[in-house]
Regions:
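C-terminal accessory/connector segments of nucleic-acid motor ATPases
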Residues: 1-20, 30-34
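Rhodanese-like catalytic fold shared by cysteine-dependent sulfurtransferases
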Residues: 2-3, 31-208
Length: 208
């Protein structure tokens, strides 16, 4: 599996490969790297979070063909961790360091990501989504936030795709996954709240 999957993809091969709509472009880098610049239509599930459970939950079908984006020298780790949960259909990878120009592959996006202090002071003009689990939400959330857990975001959200949506989770990992799914589904006005509800809660209690 490792030998088959350990195939570096150059921009020309990438364009040919991605003409197949069934291929999932999986970005496994750190959250802040994805936020800053990522390939259009890529799904974010970072290696440094609960990687395997979320791959299983979001991609579902173990036969899904995957091209992944990773940090330099983490290629084997991605393939091994995918393989452990049955995802063996890796077609290749793009490894990224400071000199990599992702725009050579295809159009790139960035994700607006804001400090919780800004979010708390300025949230009246948008819908707010809490993408944590129902039980986390029931234990306390931000005023006016609507709960759509991450594993239901793909099927449960019906909202105008150009209207502003602000998303948070507990610590800032799941909300970026959710944003990546919504971006791929055509949402264009998304804001990720960094550090999530754990930080929001601390700030609010310190201001009271």
């Amino acid at each position: 599996i490792l030998k088959k999957s350990l195939k570096k993809i150059d921009p020309i091969n990438f364009k040919e490969l991605m003409s197949d709509d069934s291929i999932v472009l999986l970005d496994t880098r750190k959250t802040d790297q994805f936020v800053k610049c990522h390939l259009k239509d890529s799904i974010y599930i970072g290696l440094d979070g609960r990687f395997a459970p979320w791959v299983g939950e979001i991609l579902k079908d173990i036969n899904t063909p995957i091209v992944f984006i990773c940090e330099l020298n983490r290629e084997r780790e991605v393939i091994t961790r995918l393989s452990r949960i049955g995802f063996d259909n890796c077609l290749g990878y793009i490894s990224v360091d400071n000199s990599t120009n992702l725009e050579l592959y295809q159009e790139t996006n960035s994700l607006e990501s804001i400090d919780p202090k800004i979010f708390i002071k300025n949230n009246s003009n948008s819908k707010i989504l809490d993408v944590r689990t129902k039980s986390e939400y029931n234990n306390g959330s931000f005023k006016n936030a609507i709960n759509i857990p991450l594993n239901k975001i793909d099927s449960s959200l019906s909202y105008p795709k150009d209207k502003k949506l602000q998303l948070f989770c507990a610590g800032g990992y799941r909300s970026v996954i959710a944003c990546s799914i919504l971006l791929k589904n055509g949402y264009t006005n998304l804001v990720n709240v960094e550090k999530g509800y754990s930080r929001i809660k601390k700030l609010i209690s310190s201001w009271l």
